[in-house]
Structures are given as structure tokens and as C-alpha cells.
């Protein structure tokens, strides 16, 4: 199975380097749940940014911006889909109207062709 983790720092209590360090610890601790891919979704300049790579967390180096204070992370153990195809790795981008969002899940989705958002 995979792991989902995150950080919310609305008051900007931590600077970008401190957030990076904390997320590194969280993601590396989550490697026991998946080493096939690591990904992050975060805010920057009022927009959603998704950064993901087909590597274990200890090989992924996240660089955050000072305004990035809401971050979601995911470590993946591939059970379906090629881990080298980054489209299969989390988080996934989504959009409803003008609202962008990131999605990560734990488990296998069946009948994806029937899913509607």
C-alpha cells in the first residue's frame, strides 16, 4: 500500500527550509509503505503545483517557495500501472470549474472509465 502525508502551516510558523526538512522526514518515514514513486502537491503564487518522480522519497529533493504553506505528499507502491509513467504516480491534478485540486488515494481504483468528477 501507499502512504499519504502532509503539512499545513497557515501562520507561516516555519520557513521554507524548515518545511522542506519536515517533509523530507515525513516522506522518508513513509517509504516503508512505498518506494516506487514520490509526489507532492503544494500552493505557490495562488496556484496548485504538483511535483512527482518515479523514485523513492530519499532520492527526491523538494524545493518549496516561501508562500508554499499547504503541502500534500504521497509515496507509492505500484500495484497497477507502470511506475515509470509519471501519469500513474500521485498526486493527480483535477479541476472542477475554475477550482484546481490535487488527489491522492491509497488502494486500487477499479472501473476507472466509469468515474466521473
Where are the language model's segments positioned?
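Conserved small/polar residues in nucleotide/adenosyl-binding loops
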Residues: 115-117
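N-terminal glutamine amidotransferase
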Residues: 1-108, 112
